[in-house]
Amino acid sequence: MNKLNPLKFGIIGCSRIAKKSVIPAILKSEFAELEMIGSRTNDKAKEFSNEFNCKKNGTYDDVISDDSINVIYISTPIGTHEELAIKAACAGKHVYCEKSSTDSFTSAKKMVECSKNNNVRIMEGFMFRFHPQHQKVKELINNKKIGNIDSFNG
């Protein structure tokens, strides 16, 4: 059996979700490697790199232009997502963008068209549907263990 080459991730944005969820998941996966961390400030990029034993760090553009990276995880403020996702796609990188990926249909359309034109994938980071805590809540609801549901916002 052939072993798949791991996806080499570049992180753009040193957010809490990157720190607590995404980077630990990358480090645990046999199918992914943490290649580089980028931030607006060198100090923050170095801090995250040291914490996660990542050898490379730099700016957002450094991450996008690094030839060893094939997937970019974007975890920055929503107003930066379109520009960063398009730059990454134009550089031939797949994009995993934290939710919400954009605040407009026009912006989303540009991001998707760019990824199609560059033969890369783009995905929004909405992954809670099958999270164990949500599955447990679903089980409790289905087994009528928590009473009647009058409304739900999720």
Task: Please identify what each model-predicted range represents.
Residues V71, P77-I78, E82-R129, K144:
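Beta-strand-loop-alpha-helix segment that lines the small-molecule cofactor/substrate pocket
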Residues N5-L7, V120, G147-D150:
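Nucleotide donor/acceptor-binding cores
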Residues Y60-V63, S101-D103:
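Short, acidic/turn-prone active-site loops that include or flank metal/cofactor-
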Residues M1-F52:
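N-terminal Rossmann-like dinucleotide-binding module
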Residues N53-Y60:
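Conserved SAM-binding strand-loop segment of SAM-dependent methyltransferases
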Residues S21, E47, D62, V71, ...:
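Alpha-helical elements of Rossmann-like donor-binding domains used by nucleotide-donor carbohydrate transfer enzymes
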Residues F128-G154:
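Predominantly a Rossmann-like dinucleotide-binding segment in NAD(P)-dependent oxidoreductases
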Residues M36, N70-V71, R121, S151:
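Short, Asp-centered acidic motifs that coordinate Mg2+ and/or phosphate
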